[in-house]
Amino acid sequence: MECADYGLTRKLERDNLNLNPLQRGGVLPAAARKALHEFGDGYSVCDYCDGRLDQVTRPAINCFLDDLADFTGSDAVRTVHGAREGKFAVMHALCERGDTVVVDGNAHYTTHLAAERNGLEIVEVPSTGHPSYEVTPEAYREVLEETIDRVEVKLAVLTHVDGNYGNLTDARGVADVCRKLGVPLLLNCAYSMGRLPVNLRELGVDFVVGSGHKSMAASGPIGVLGMKSEWEDTVLRRSGRHEKKELELLGCTSRGAPLATLMASLPYVRERVSRWDGEVKKTRYLVSELEDIGGIEQLGVRPKEHDLVRFETPVFHEIAASHPRKGFFLYEELKKRGIVGIRRGQTKWFKCSIYGMTEEQVQYVVDSFRDIVEENR
């Protein structure tokens, strides 16, 4: 049997400015690339394991988890395969089939899948709709009170920053509402933990989940699950047959390269969140400059509080209507200028992020969009 050529190269994405929001927070620093080489083989972190991944001392996973708990303001923390697995584990531990959970209208599809796989009923908190798509504590209060009148709500889930509009929600405000109504709250921080400061205790939530590969400069798949101490016995309960193994995590979770790169990146990530205000400033500049071109409008809450931006772009859609390359022209014009990350054929709208770019790179992106409009309008 001959295997196909699987096209295992990312030269285009590595050698150009990548605007894809999925990629910006997962770029590995030098220390993580070294760890990737060192721990790339299979179960490489398990050479000295005595049955519990969180207790491995060589490499010092136990110490790393202590530092990770401190970083996230959690009483207990575990690595999981991704934020979605963290959400599923919490739902499975707290709920029974047929129970009800309340989620926000901007929730990631994996929140819905985690609930569906657990056999749960989903009640949605609506956003304000176009153009801001904001989810507010008041909306949570109204939906929770109305739902609690009918059924018991076992868990509320809030998306800290959503992947469609990049709205940073008022997590502390929603947590206050949930606490008063006696409903535990899980905060989905896939787009925030590792980019901006996230502290479970300060926000007043019960659980946080994060994404190492999306926002914490790690290889995927790996996520973070943090919790208050009061939930440890429930979520981290042990197997009756294999007494060392934590049942909801199916024993050991992410091993090898993903875990090693997350460990290696933590010092870098801890430092970079202190520069979050600068990232917001750059993003607001991008929005201002692109909107100044005309025919481009930012969706979501204003002013921006996160690097992920969604733009409506009728100017590019109008150009595409008469351009020989139709909807592919924007992708191709950007690629010629060394910019990637916008989907091929997409001109009505697009999402982008300049997280981690220098001011010079941001200016180059702005100038490139302006030039494309001027040359093709």
From Swiss-Prot:
Reactions that this protein is recorded to catalyse: O-phospho-L-seryl-tRNA(Cys) + hydrogen sulfide + H(+) = L-cysteinyl-tRNA(Cys) + phosphate
The protein's enzyme class: transferase
Residues at which pyridoxal 5'-phosphate binds: 83-84, 188, 211-213
Gene Ontology MF term list: Sep-tRNA:Cys-tRNA synthase activity
Its EC number(s): 2.5.1.73
A single BP term in Gene Ontology: translation
Keywords, alphabetical: Protein biosynthesis, Pyridoxal phosphate, Transferase
Name of the protein in question: O-phospho-L-seryl-tRNA:Cys-tRNA synthase
